[in-house]
Amino acid sequence: MGKISSLPTQLFKCCFCDFLKQVKMPVTSSSHLFYLALCLLAFSSSATAGPETLCGAELVDALQFVCGDRGFYFNKPTGYGSSSRRAPQTGIVDECCFRSCDLRRLEMYCAPLKAAKSARSVRAQRHTDMPKAQKEVHLKNTSRGSAGNKNYRM
């Protein structure tokens, strides 16, 4: 994945706008042509250059942008991929900092979406929502283990 706006691209846009302003003038000097040639050279070198890498804070910013509220992992989640053999563990730094990576590669490191919980799930109920008899049994079972008739403190 390349950066959204690289320096050569910004330079080309700036140069191109300036050149268009100059074209409106009837007289074109050699300095204007040189300036345009320099801009075209900068643009062509950025187009032929390989994809850029993301490291450090730039990598974290890109992951936060791509994954949003889900969060992300620095290593691939367990069970990732279809190979049964244990391959050496690679992480996002190996894939995007030492080599270039694209948007799909970044998305592979996003945490899965959490399933929406119902408003009244059983675990979400407070102790005050239970009938008194269930509440006493529940509190007794959570503070002590039982083996037969004997109660042991945990």
Curated annotation (Swiss-Prot):
Broad class of the protein's primary localization: secreted
Region of interest called A, as start-end residue ranges on this chain: 91-111
PROSITE patterns reported for this sequence: INSULIN
Organism annotation: Ovis aries
Family, per entry: Belongs to the insulin family.
Gene name per UniProt: IGF1
UniProt biased composition (Basic and acidic residues): 126-139
Subcellular location: Secreted
GO biological process, one term: positive regulation of cell population proliferation
Residue ranges, annotated region (C): 79-90
Keywords linked to the UniProt accession: Disulfide bond, Growth factor, Secreted, Signal
Record CDD domains: IlGF
Region entry B, spans: 50-78
Span list, region D: 112-119
Propeptide: 120-154
Protein name as catalogued: Insulin-like growth factor 1
Region (Disordered) location: 121-154
Biased composition (Polar residues): 140-154
Keyword Secreted found: yes
